[in-house]
Structures are given as structure tokens and as C-alpha cells.
Amino acid sequence: MTPALKEWSAAVHALLDGRQTVLLRKGGIGEKRFEVAAHEFLLFPTVAHSHAERVRPEHRDLLGPAAADSTDECVLLRAAAKVVAALPVNRPEGLDAIEDLHIWTAESVRADRLDFRPKHRLAVLVVSAIPLAEPVRLARTPEYGGCTSWVQLPVTPTLAAPVH
């Protein structure tokens, strides 16, 4: 089994396209807080919490292609990631300084990351994105559902060269 971090499909595409180099995490509703359970992992594409207004206009071209990677029937794995650094956010006002490292609007970061579960600290994961040599299609099963950050997948795909 291989660990996979659930991440919005548009962010996975942004990582592979070199437009994003960080992941902003607090943990799912079913978790007390986010833990870096693995430093190398697959990226499991999701769209459950996606809305076009959460992405800055210059990155909205990712939404169409990304939506096809996570359907009711299957998911298409395209990427893995390696954590280069995991940094707790102590000063939320400092998030403006990393705006060019992700695709989210400032309002989305505030509402979906900072204001969500305000007692929990936001983690910024600096990652190296690694495309899979060949995308892997998996049937969607109940084990992949729920509001958790991590799932275990029954695949060990071959990786290509890192994007960044």
C-alpha cells in the first residue's frame, strides 16, 4: 500500500504545471489536526470542495482538465510529491508573501484554511512535484471517501523526473 494525500485536483495540475509549490493543510473534519504521515506520497485528486471562485482568475484554466480526474466512478492519479519542508503558520498575515506559490485566492485561504477550525495551526508544506511515468486509474471505493487527509492506495507506480 502507498500513502496518498487528498488534494484538490486543480492543485495537483498546478503542481505538475509548475504554478504551485506549496500545499496548505489543516486536516480533514474527521481528524484532530493535520499530520505529515509520509514525506513522499501520491496525490489523490478530489473535487468535493471545489468552486471556481476559490482559484485566482489566471489559474482557472486548470479547472476543466482537473475535474475529469476525480469522478463518482474513478480517480486518475497523475502525481506524487515529496515534502521539502513543513512549516507551521504562526503569523497568518505572512501568507500574502507566499501568494505566488499557490493558485488560491486570498479570500479562499482565509475562509477555507485560516478561519476553518481556528484553534488548529495551518501547515505550509513546501513540496517537490513528481509526475507518474503513466497515470493510474483507480475505481472509486468507499475507503477513499470521508473528510480525512490521507488514504492508502494499492498501487506502486513508476515516477518520472520531478517538476521542481
Which residue ranges define each predicted feature?
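Structured alpha/beta reader/binder surfaces that contact nucleic acids or chromatin modification marks
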Residues: 1-164
